[in-house]
Design a protein with these regions (language model features):
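Pyridoxal 5′-phosphate
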Residues: 1-112
Length: 112
């Protein structure tokens, strides 16, 4: 029996999620930002329903859920928000651990 411990980069996907995504990828190939046709509308509905489901799951408003292209973009957005907050409350330092993800370290270094 093996045990997978590297959940930082990837993780196993729930079988229900795989089944749902296969259906989406097979039948809903419109661009969610192209709402001038039914394919875009269908894709937009899928995205917005997912946003609402996630918001309900974590107890926030749907407008507070943002989708990004991946962890690097998410880390950058979070750190830029933290930097703005630190500036607003007149704090001069953000402390980052040396064992953080490379994207976090690089984003923090760019703020020095």
């Amino acid at each position: 029996m093996s045990i997978y411990l590297d959940y930082n980069a990837s993780s196993p996907i729930n079988k229900d999620v795989i089944e749902y995504m296969v259906d989406v990828y097979s039948n809903s190939y419109g661009n969610a930002d192209s709402r001038t046709h039914i394919y875009g509308e269908n894709a937009r509905n899928i995205v917005e329903n997912a946003r609402k489901d996630i918001a309900d799951l974590i107890g926030v408003q749907a407008g507070e859920v943002f989708f990004t292209s991946g962890s690097t973009e998410s880390n950058n957005i979070a750190l830029l928000g933290l930097k703005q907050y630190a500036n607003d409350v007149n704090k001069k330092h953000i402390i980052i651990s040396s064992i953080e993800h490379k994207a976090v370290l690089e984003a923090a270094r760019s703020m020095e």
